[in-house]
Curated annotation (Swiss-Prot):
Participates actively in the response to hyperosmotic and heat shock by preventing the aggregation of stress-denatured proteins, in association with DnaK and GrpE. It is the nucleotide exchange factor for DnaK and may function as a thermosensor. Unfolded proteins bind initially to DnaJ; upon interaction with the DnaJ-bound protein, DnaK hydrolyzes its bound ATP, resulting in the formation of a stable complex. GrpE releases ADP from DnaK; ATP binding to DnaK triggers the release of the substrate protein, thus completing the reaction cycle. This is Protein GrpE. It is found in: Cytoplasm. Gene3D superfamilies: 3.90.20.20, Head domain of nucleotide exchange factor GrpE. It comes from the Bacteria. It comes from Borrelia hermsii (strain HS1 / DAH).
Length: 182
């Protein structure tokens, strides 16, 4: 009996669905289907265009990045060219005068100009001088000597200067360190 009731209820539900759904052959259903197909087509087209725009944007971004990297050092190169010109003039001048003191003076001026310019423009600093306290984060001890009266390890000789760029060590200074005999 229960099974019969279920079958009747199922048939009633199917009849109600058939009443609420428009006939597939009706003109309003065909119009609605055409509208939906048109909307789907428009959305697919929009999706493909947006996808192409994104791909073009990604390619343009990659090209801009490559150009940025390629030309990032242009200003530094221009500065180096100026320093090379000055160095060339110093060499040419020394060939004419054969005066070692003049050559030394010219090269010292070029070194000062390079360091000053790079400090101002690029925040590149040179460090490592005799008398400075030894700092293992900035200095590399190549040799050590024991010395009376030294409270903290200090630099007594510099083999190679160190450089830092924006407070980041590019190269440690190679130094000789004096420390207490204790």
């Amino acid at each position: 009996m229960e099974e019969k009731k279920r079958c009747e209820e199922s048939e009633k539900i199917k009849e109600q669905e058939n009443e609420t759904l428009p006939n597939e052959d009706s003109p309003s259903m065909g119009k609605k289907v055409a509208e939906l197909e048109n909307e789907i087509s428009n959305l697919k087209d929009l999706y493909l265009r947006k996808q192409a725009e994104f791909e073009n944007f990604r390619k343009r971004l990659e090209k801009d990045k490559e150009n940025f990297i390629k030309f990032a050092n242009e200003n530094i190169m221009k500065d180096i060219i100026n320093f090379l010109d000055n160095l060339e003039r110093a060499i040419d001048s020394s060939k004419q005068s054969k005066d070692f003191d003049t050559l030394l003076s010219g090269i010292s001026m070029i070194e000062s100009e390079v360091l000053s310019s790079f400090d101002k423009k690029y925040n590149l600093k040179k460090f490592g001088k005799p008398g400075e306290d030894f700092d293992p984060s900035q200095h590399e001890a190549i040799s050590i000597e024991e010395k009376e009266g030294v409270k903290t390890p200090e630099i007594v000789e510099v083999y190679q200067k160190g450089y830092c760029y924006n407070n980041r060590v590019l190269r440690t200074a190679k130094v000789k360190v004096a420390q207490s005999k204790n």
